[in-house]
């Protein structure tokens, strides 16, 4: 099935609210399990970068799991970051270790060779030019940094996409059902992501299908 791009940002208030209120506990928990499989240790003193942080659920999970780490969290949507700020304000102990950044990729607010860990969940499919994500990874990561990028995976047919929408968003508001459907059409296949890594000159990362609708790019960059 051919890729269909979708808007890069969720800027509408109703979109951001529906996304924030949706139950993404299953994929977000999967993301943290995959991170643990990378055996990052305690991450004491480590600084992570979360690209496309949305309402910051993964940021909160990360900071809770790794209490000695810090995280910079970037998103281009002011509406999403407003929900992220509200979530962090409810957890002041975690908020002290997080900096929210509103910007698009490429971002001149992100320092080079600065981060021990690069995280991203559900950003890649939003990007019309996916190379910008991999350029940001190589620019921002320290040598030997850990990388975990998880995203939706484009299904082979429109019927398959509709079945996934029915399975995982059957009771969701229509705005969220439409966003999920559009995101499935906009997502990449594993072989396309592999080609992106080759184009970016990134070695050492593994691509894996990690659910019936997600793929992950993970591993450690060369030192």
Task: Describe each PLM feature range.
Residues 25-44:
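Conserved alpha-helix/loop element of class I SAM-dependent methyltransferases that forms part
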Residues 117-129:
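A short SAM/SAH-binding and catalytic strip from SAM-dependent methyltransferases
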Residues 127-137:
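A short, conserved alpha-helix within the catalytic core of class I
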Residues 152-200, 206-208:
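C-terminal alpha-helical "lid/dimerization" subdomain adjacent to the S-adenosyl-L-methionine
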Residues 145-151:
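Conserved beta-strand signature within the Rossmann-like core of class I S-adenosyl-L-methionine
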Residues 1-18:
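N-terminal, positively charged/glycine-rich alpha-helical extensions of SAM-dependent methyltransferases
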Residues 110-117:
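A short acidic, Gly/Pro-enriched loop at the edge of an enzyme's catalytic core
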Residues 49, 56-107:
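Class I SAM-dependent methyltransferase SAM/SAH-binding core
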């Amino acid at each position: 099935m051919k890729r269909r791009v979708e808007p890069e940002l969720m800027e509408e208030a109703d979109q951001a609210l529906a996304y924030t209120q949706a139950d993404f506990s299953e994929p977000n928990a999967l993301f943290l399990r995959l991170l643990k499989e990378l055996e990052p240790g305690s991450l004491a003193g480590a600084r992570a970068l979360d690209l496309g942080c949305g309402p910051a659920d993964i940021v909160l999970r990360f900071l809770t799991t790794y209490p000695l780490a810090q995280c910079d969290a970037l998103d281009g949507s002011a509406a999403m970051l407003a929900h992220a700020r509200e979530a962090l304000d409810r957890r002041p102990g975690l908020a002290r270790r997080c900096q929210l950044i509103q910007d698009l990729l490429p971002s001149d607010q992100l320092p080079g060779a600065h981060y021990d860990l690069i995280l991203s969940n559900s950003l890649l499919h939003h990007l019309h030019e996916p190379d910008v994500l991999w350029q940001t990874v190589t620019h921002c990561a320290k040598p030997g940094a850990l990388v975990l990028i998880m995203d939706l995976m484009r299904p082979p047919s429109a019927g398959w996409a509709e079945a996934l929408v029915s399975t995982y968003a059957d009771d969701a508001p229509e705005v969220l059902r439409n966003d999920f459907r559009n995101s499935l059409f906009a997502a990449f296949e594993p072989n396309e992501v592999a080609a992106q890594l080759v184009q970016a000159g990134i070695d050492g990362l593994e691509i894996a299908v990690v659910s019936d609708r997600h793929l992950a790019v993970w591993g450690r960059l060369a030192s």
